[in-house]
A protein has these predicted regions:
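Short, functionally important structural connectors and interaction interfaces within domains
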Residues: 251-253, 421, 434
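Single conserved hydrophobic/aromatic residue that forms the stacking wall/gate
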Residues: 430-439
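A very general structural signal that marks isolated residues within well-ordered alpha-helical segments
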Residues: 184, 277, 378, 390, ...
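Short capping loops/turns at secondary-structure boundaries
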Residues: 167-174, 406, 410, 432
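Terminal accessory carbohydrate-recognition/targeting modules of carbohydrate-active enzymes
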Residues: 1-327
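Substrate-binding groove/exosite segments of carbohydrate-active enzymes
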Residues: 301-424, 429
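Glycine-centered secondary-structure boundary/capping sites
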Residues: 114-115, 425, 439
C-alpha cells in the first residue's frame, strides 16, 4: 500500500471481517421516507463527511446526494419584515452560504450475459455503519452478494498541511463503491452499470416541500477524456467510474464496466466524484482523490477516527446490550455533529448545518452551534478554534432592533472558548496579540 506507518486493513476481505458493525444504527427500506421525499432532512439517509464534502447514502444503496460548500458567507434578513423574498431568517439565524449539491441518487445495476438484470440493492437490503463512520448497504441475491458504500476521505496526517485544522477538511469529493461477489457456483459475466440524475441544488429552506422541485439541470454535460463533467454557474461535478466504457452524449451517458467473476470471486468497483462550486477547482480535488486507492483512503480515514475516539467502553454490567447501545449513541452523536460542520480548505468554519442534512441548506442557527461544536471537540478539539473565529465576527445579526437578539448565539463564543481551553490547554490563543497567527 502507498501509505506510511501501519495499515489497519490490507484487503477488503479483512475489513469486512474485522471492522466494527453497528447493530443499532441500521435500517431497511422505509416506504414512508421514500414516498414523502420532501426536504433532505425528511429522508432516511446514512451520512458521512470529511469536513468539506457531506454525503448521504440511502437504504437502497444510492448515493442520494453529496455537497460541497461555497466560500461566500452572507447575511440572512433576520427578525425584520417578511417581504416575501426567496429566503428569510428567524431569530438566531444570521448567516449562511450556498452549497454545491448534487442530488444524483446514484446507483449501480448489474446486467448479466444471460439477460438477467440485478439491482445493486433492493428493499430487503440492510444499511448500517462500519467502524462507526462508513455507510454500507449489503444485499444478498441468489446469484451474488453486494456491498455498496460511500465516503469522503480525511487527509493523511503525514501530508503537507493545507489547513489550520489538518488533516481536516478532506478533498472536495467522495468515492462511491460496490463490491460484487459471485456465489452462483459458476463463472459469471456481464456489465456493471452506473446511473444517476443530473440535478443540482444550491439554496433551499422550504421545510415540508418537495426538494426535487427546486433542482436545476446543468448548463453543460460533456465528456472530458475519462470524466463526465456536469457544469452549472453554481456547481460542478466530475464523475468517473474507473475502468469503464463511456458511451452516448454527456446529457444521456451510458457508463459500464464489463466484468467476469469466477465462482466465489469478488471485485470492488469504484466511482470517483469531485464536487466543487467552480469548474476551475475540479482538477485540484481530483488530484487529491487520485492519490490513493479507495482501500488506502479508507485506512487513512479509519485511522483518523480510531485515533480520535480510542477504545470506548461502558461500565453497565447489569445490561450489556444497553451499554453497547450507549457506546454507539455517544459515537454517533459526535460524528453526526461533525457532519453538520462545513469548512473552507484553509480550515476556517463556513457554517454549522441545523442537521446533517438540514432542511435549510448551509444556514447556521445560533442555538445549535454551541452543543454541536462542544460535542465534536471531545474528538476533534481543533474545530473549536475555527468556530471561535467565526463567532467572534458573526455572533450578532447584520442588523437588529435589539442589542443581543439571541442570547444563545451571543454567548456561544464564551462557552466554546471555555471548553476549548479545558480540552486543549491552548493558552496561546488567548494571550497572543494576533490569535489567528496561532493557527
Amino acid at each position: 500500500m502507498h501509505l506510511r506507518g501501519n495499515v489497519i486493513y490490507n484487503t477488503w476481505e479483512n475489513f469486512w471481517k474485522k471492522a466494527y458493525k453497528s447493530s443499532y444504527f441500521r435500517a431497511q427500506y422505509d416506504e414512508t421516507s421514500e414516498r414523502t421525499d420532501w426536504s433532505l432532512s425528511e429522508r432516511q439517509l446514512f451520512t458521512q463527511s470529511n469536513g468539506r464534502t457531506l454525503l448521504g447514502q440511502d437504504t437502497m444503496g444510492r448515493l442520494h446526494f453529496l455537497c460541497t460548500p461555497h466560500d461566500k458567507i452572507y447575511a440572512v434578513p433576520s427578525g425584520g419584515t417578511d417581504l416575501g423574498g426567496q429566503f428569510k431568517g428567524y431569530i438566531g439565524q444570521y448567516y449562511q452560504n450556498d452549497t454545491a449539491l448534487l442530488l444524483g441518487k446514484m446507483k449501480y445495476d448489474l446486467e448479466l450475459d444471460n439477460g438477467l438484470m440485478i439491482s445493486g440493492a433492493n428493499k430487503q437490503s440492510w444499511t448500517t455503519y462500519y467502524d462507526d463512520f462508513l455507510p454500507v448497504t449489503a444485499t444478498e441475491h441468489p446469484e451474488l452478494e453486494t456491498r455498496i458504500f460511500s465516503f469522503a476521505p480525511i487527509l493523511e496526517k503525514e501530508a503537507v498541511p493545507a489547513s489550520s485544522i489538518h488533516p481536516v477538511p478532506g478533498p472536495a469529493g467522495a468515492f462511491y463503491c460496490i463490491e460484487v461477489k459471485n456465489i452462483s457456483g459458476c463463472k459469471m459475466k456481464g456489465k456493471l452499470r452506473l446511473s444517476f440524475d443530473q440535478k443540482f441544488v444550491n439554496q433551499f429552506e422550504h421545510y415540508g416541500k418537495y426538494f426535487d422541485d427546486y433542482t436545476v439541470t446543468p448548463y453543460k454535460s460533456e465528456w472530458d477524456q475519462k470524466l463526465l463533467v456536469l457544469w452549472h454557474p453554481e456547481a460542478c461535478a466530475a464523475i468517473q467510474l474507473l475502468d469503464s466504457v463511456c458511451e452516448g452524449q454527456g446529457d444521456n451517458p451510458r457508463i459500464y464496466v464489463p466484468f467476469e467473476l469466477k465462482a466465489n470471486e469478488s471485485r470492488t468497483f469504484t466511482t470517483v466524484i469531485a464536487l466543487t462550486p467552480k469548474r476551475e477547482e475540479i482538477y485540484s480535488a481530483l488530484g487529491t482523490l487520485y492519490q490513493h486507492t479507495p482501500l488506502e483512503w479508507l485506512n487513512v480515514t479509519d485511522d483518523f477516527w480510531k485515533e480520535r475516539f480510542g477504545k470506548i467502553t461502558t461500565d453497565i454490567r447489569e445490561n450489556q446490550e444497553a451499554g453497547e447501545k450507549y457506546r454507539d449513541m455517544q459515537v454517533r452523536f459526535i460524528l453526526d455533529n461533525f457532519n453538520c460542520l462545513s469548512f473552507r480548505e484553509d480550515g476556517s468554519l463556513l457554517t454549522n448545518w441545523q442537521g446533517a442534512p438540514s432542511h435549510s441548506l448551509s444556514r447556521l442557527w445560533g442555538i445549535d452551534i454551541t452543543p454541536d461544536v462542544v460535542s465534536v471537540m471531545y474528538a476533534v478539539p481543533e474545530v473549536g478554534k475555527s468556530a471561535m473565529f467565526y463567532l467572534a465576527e458573526r455572533n450578532r445579526p447584520r442588523y437588529s432592533l435589539y442589542s443581543d437578539h439571541s442570547m444563545f448565539y451571543y454567548i456561544s463564543l464564551l462557552v466554546i472558548a471555555g471548553k476549548y481551553l479545558e480540552l486543549t490547554g491552548d493558552c496561546l490563543l488567548y494571550t497572543s496579540p494576533s490569535p489567528r497567527d496561532t493557527r
